[in-house]
Amino acid sequence: MAAKSKTPPPVDSLTRSQARVEHKRLALEIETHNERYYQQDAPTVSDATYDALQRRLEAIEARFPDLVTASSPTQTVGAAPARGFAKVQHAVPMLSLGNAFSDAEVAEFVERIRRFLKLGADDMPAIVAEPKIDGLSLSLRYENGDLVRAATRGDGFTGEDVTANVRTIADVPHKLNGHNIPTACELRGEVYMLKEDFLALNKKQQEAGDTVFANPRNSAAGSLRQKDVSITASRPLKFFAYAWGEMTDRPAETQNDMLEWLRDVGFIVNPLIQLCHSVDEVLAFYRRIGEQRATLGYDIDGVVYKVDRLDWQERLGFVSRSPRWAIAHKFAAEQAMTILRGIDIQVGRTGAMTPVARLEPVTVGGVVVQNATLHNEDYIRGLGNDGQPIRDGIDLRIGDTVVVQRAGDVIPQVVSVIIEKRPANAKRYEFPDRCPICGSHAVREEGEAVRRCTGALICPAQAVERLKHFVSRLAFDIDGLGEKQIQEFYDDGLVMHPVDIFTLQERDARAENKLRDRDGYGDVSVRNLFAAIDARRRIELNRLIFALGIRHVGEGNAKLLARHYGSIESFRSAMTEAAAAQTEAGNDSEAYADLTNIGGIGDIVADAVVEFFAEPRNVKALNDLLEEIEVLPVAQARSDSAVAGKTVVFTGSLEKFTRDEAKASAERVGAKTSSSVSKKTDLVVAGPGAGSKLKDAEKFGVKVISEDEWLKLIEG
């Protein structure tokens, strides 16, 4: 570690805020040195330097005792860095909000509340209005005032445990201050990044040759989910608190007073929040925030309105996955004019060639936009997907003045051309008939708007994206082998095909330059990587089929194919037969007919699967892979179970299953699952926090059972 030229200020001169920031920095620095010393046997500082860091941390904690935590280096030694995220069930689901896009919809939201609560025509419920931060939702659990767990929102019911990472965020108190602290509580808010910090981070990433982030929200989310906690600590993350979940003793009776309480216990609450007493006040706040939007230091994508009285919130309850007592008033899509400087082609995992506009940089909604999607070649020509004219049939040309639109998280897009400003030298764009990456022919299938590269596995663009898909969560899901590592290994020629992942350890043993000698690696991380790869040498058939990256074959279709064929041998044999017959005699083979007769698999999916197996290089890649892995046959669903053939809906927070595991348990006993309750539903399995689906079950006369009853039913 390079010596710092500037002497830090004396501890006695630090303010509490300065001390808190330095305390976190010192704790992370010491933990990093502990890891290098205790885990890697590779210290990078002298004992004297390490002792000086430790003494300064102790001095800060002596002056500010409330900064001491159980995880402080003064209390423990050498905690290992996070290597993955455990699942966390939210005690109270983190639901989404309904949206309003007009003043009339906001007025109707207030009117619905008034009707539901049976208020008089002149009675206006007080409404708390607050900016809608464009970040990552986070739930913080405190017990006896101490932060014990932090979790991302996830699917609303199950999130990722990011406690170690969150402890590095200066805005998140490790201990709640003051009085009136509940025994247990879940406090919630948004992790975000300031615009100026985002730009500085991207500049640093670019200079280091690392991936840059698309926007502040993505950078905040990516920074929080780092497996190396020191990376999170190095990122300038912020946190606004604005809500809560489970709480043993609620300290206030209104939304506004709860926000004040959050401030009192140590959180930063957005200062722009306002209590409104009329629809006019609410809409005036919305317009004022909209006018300030570009000057704020952080991204917002609307305004959130919440009923102030908490007892009214409880009476109003929830509908579907959102509360009746709150709504998000989204900003209208924002537009700006700029110059179209060029058009590039991006090649995706399936070979889809997508045109991207390169624009003169322009600020749209407070965000600098330099690129925008152009969808496909018809869009450039002024035609929609139905072949009908769009933009009055005006094509896009290099040099045109165009209108760019950005709406929320949607990728910026070119929506119109200012034809009056078209220069005489504006250049027509000719869509390429060859892949710009590998030079293979690009073809456009009948009825499709997309042109695709036919290079398959020989196209570097597709190869990298296919490999990233291969290791994705629903496919092989190899811990420690994510998109960054795949790109790095591909660039260095270590992993060019799926099978290379499973021969990596063998080749590394023979290599002169070992993986452990690379930047960011070491003996421990390499051992863990190889162990994670070995753990995936046995995989379910549906995961393998999904991992192949066949067009139109997502998670659901992969399961349908796996259930039908049962084993990789049957699947491979049938598809090879269908592919051979397609070459010789069209699509009249018995194997093809069997494929199209699978419920849910139509001609489009069937053709895509057969086309995959008709490419010899794809078959070779699969055969090579099967030499290294074992594909588990599909367990046949029980036909003798009490729920065989029944339709089951799971709702609420499940304690013994994740949602995916619950669905799998139903499928194993021959049941079907659905996401909604209807007349066709046979059974609802309800956990804590179940909402409207229980009412629907009562409405349709559907039997409701608990999770424990479900377990007894399927195990019987």
From Swiss-Prot:
Single GO BP term: DNA replication
GO cellular component, one term: cytosol
EC number: 6.5.1.2
Reaction catalyzed: NAD(+) + (deoxyribonucleotide)n-3'-hydroxyl + 5'-phospho-(deoxyribonucleotide)m = (deoxyribonucleotide)n+m + AMP + beta-nicotinamide D-nucleotide
CDD domains from the UniProt entry: BRCT_DNA_ligase_like, LIGANc
InterPro entries recorded: BRCT_dom (IPR001357), BRCT_dom_sf (IPR036420), DisA/LigA_HHH (IPR041663), DNA_ligase (IPR001679), DNA_ligase_AS (IPR018239), DNA_ligase_CS (IPR033136), DNAligase_adenylation (IPR013839), DNAligase_N (IPR013840)
Active site: K132 (n6-amp-lysine intermediate)
Binding site for NAD(+): D47, A48, T49, Y50, D51, S96, L97, E130, R153, E190, K306, K330
Domain BRCT, chain residue ranges per copy: 638-716
Residues binding Zn(2+), per UniProt: C435, C438, C453, C459
Keywords: DNA damage, DNA repair, DNA replication, Ligase, Magnesium, Manganese, Metal-binding, NAD, Zinc
UniProt-recorded Gene Ontology molecular function terms: DNA ligase (NAD+) activity; metal ion binding
Cofactor(s) the protein needs: Mg(2+); Mn(2+)
Pfam families per the UniProt record, alphabetical: BRCT (PF00533), DNA_ligase_aden (PF01653), DNA_ligase_OB (PF03120), DNA_ligase_ZBD (PF03119), HHH_2 (PF12826)
Disulfide bonds: none
PANTHER family per UniProt: CHROMOSOME TRANSMISSION FIDELITY FACTOR 18, DNA LIGASE
Role description: DNA ligase that catalyzes the formation of phosphodiester linkages between 5'-phosphoryl and 3'-hydroxyl groups in double-stranded DNA using NAD as a coenzyme and as the energy source for the reaction. It is essential for DNA replication and repair of damaged DNA.
Protein family: Belongs to the NAD-dependent DNA ligase family. LigA subfamily.
Name used for this protein in its record: DNA ligase
